[in-house]
Regions:
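Alpha/beta-hydrolase fold nucleophile elbow
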Residues: 154-164
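Bacterial Sec-dependent N-terminal signal peptides
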Residues: 1-27, 204-212
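Conserved alpha/beta-hydrolase
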Residues: 106-126
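Alpha/beta-hydrolase
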Residues: 7-8, 172-310
Length: 404
């Protein structure tokens, strides 16, 4: 989602002492020397993007349990990209595994950035492994510690950001540590209040136009009606791409993929409903559209297992969404709309929405210096922040915008 005009203008107002002119960089060796003096981090120089002068892959040693700082540790991967120590710092709090890339905000502000991988994802998996330390608060403590560490070097303004689950993480961090940064820009940060948040259902029933919603529904119905033609294609696709569906079950996974379509279409689609196939379309056209917009690869074993940390968080604190099955009851044989198959087999999560409700209330009524950005078609906007006008925070919704 690209907000190219308003965000720069707002930041110029919020940070009127910023200087965006290029300055002669004399701090390269100074930064590396400083990094080498910090205990409990590992530093490797990497090639920077062209807007930066230096970049590093860094592993920060973190307590697995911040309530027991002398206990077992793990290494959390971050990427630091440098321009000037006096310029702003954008810190992206990612919700998943992370690869180094340049954020929209650091390009706009021509400033430094840190990309933070989320605990239990990618290269940042604790050992010994214990699900109970994968919590919102523990991750916020990770982020707080990283910010404290690098504030010793970077004296400019700090801006936190994140996309999708990372946007939620920026909100979570702000709730626990509001003084850590000067401003926050969460992109598409949902705050679910239930394991099957009903706001998602209502969103899908009201987004776009009645004609477009009808085309989405009719396509789902078409996929069920053409099950005998499409299901063998899914099996062939699975064989070619070495996908298995043993966790959910092959036929049940097909049904959930069709149910997921209405969510996935609005999440990632461009809103051009004229491109949705209908009963006059060929089986190949239906399949290609389904593959591009549905959940065919969302329910395979590898995808589920790689997302186990996310799903564990959904079933403990984050919340999630389920699927409405009543309108397809004449077609469904296996799916009941719930997703317990997403829960890691070696875990026993208990869902507790109390923290999310507190954070949602805080974000709506008390959060200062936030710019909440959402997409107008994205179902994840439905559990987004609803501001009450009590603070200086603003919410921006891109018309017809997706999750991207």
């Amino acid at each position: 989602m690209k907000i190219k005009l308003l965000v720069p203008a707002i930041f110029l107002l919020m940070f009127s002492n910023f200087s965006f002119s290029q300055v002669e960089d004399t701090l390269n060796s100074d930064l590396y020397s400083w990094l080498k003096t910090i205990p409990d981090i590992e530093v490797t120089a990497i090639k920077p993007d062209k807007i930066f002068t230096e970049a590093y892959e860094i592993f920060v040693t973190q307590p697995i349990d911040h309530n027991n700082p002398d206990g077992p540790k793990f290494k959390e991967q971050i990427f630091l990209s440098h321009v000037d120590k006096d310029k702003p710092m954008v810190i992206e709090l990612d919700g998943y595994a992370v690869n180094n890339r340049t954020t929209e905000l650091s390009r706009i502000l021509e400033c430094n950035q840190i990309m933070v991988e989320h605990r239990y994802f990618g290269e940042s998996v604790p050992s010994p492994f214990d699900w109970k330390y994968l919590t919102i608060k523990q991750a916020a403590d990770d982020h707080h510690r990283i910010i404290e560490l690098f504030k010793d070097y970077y004296s400019g303004k700090w801006i936190s950001t994140g996309i999708s689950k990372g946007g939620s993480c920026a909100i979570f961090h702000g709730y626990f540590y509001p003084a850590d940064v000067n401003a926050s820009v969460p992109y598409v940060g949902p705050l679910n209040l239930s394991i099957d948040d009903q706001r998602v259902y209502e969103w899908i029933k009201s987004v776009s136009t009645p004609e477009c919603r009808e085309k989405v529904f009719n396509f789902q119905k078409l996929c069920f009606e053409k099950r005998d033609e499409l299901y063998p294609i899914i099996l062939k696709n699975a064989e070619e791409k070495k996908l298995t569906y043993n966790i959910v079950g092959y036929e049940k996974a097909y049904e959930y993929s069709v149910l997921e379509y209405s969510f996935a279409y609005w999440q990632w689609g461009n809103g051009d409903c004229s491109l949705i196939p209908d009963e006059n379309s060929s089986t190949e056209e239906i399949w290609e559209h389904f593959l591009a917009n549905g959940g065919v690869t969302y329910f395979d074993d590898e995808s589920i297992e790689s997302n186990y940390p996310f799903f564990y968080q959904c079933y403990t604190e984050f919340g999630y969404y389920a699927y409405e099955v009543d309108k397809f009851k004449d077609y469904i044989r296996y799916a009941d709309g719930q997703t317990p198959f997403f829960i890691p087999k070696d875990s026993n999560p208990t869902y507790d929405p109390r923290l999310l409700k507190k954070i949602n209330n805080w974000a709506s009524n008390e959060a200062e210096n936030f710019i909440f950005i959402y997409g107008g078609n994205d179902p994840w906007t439905s559990p987004g922040v609803c501001l009450t006008g009590k603070t200086n925070s603003i919410k921006m919704v891109l018309p017809n915008g997706s999750h991207a």
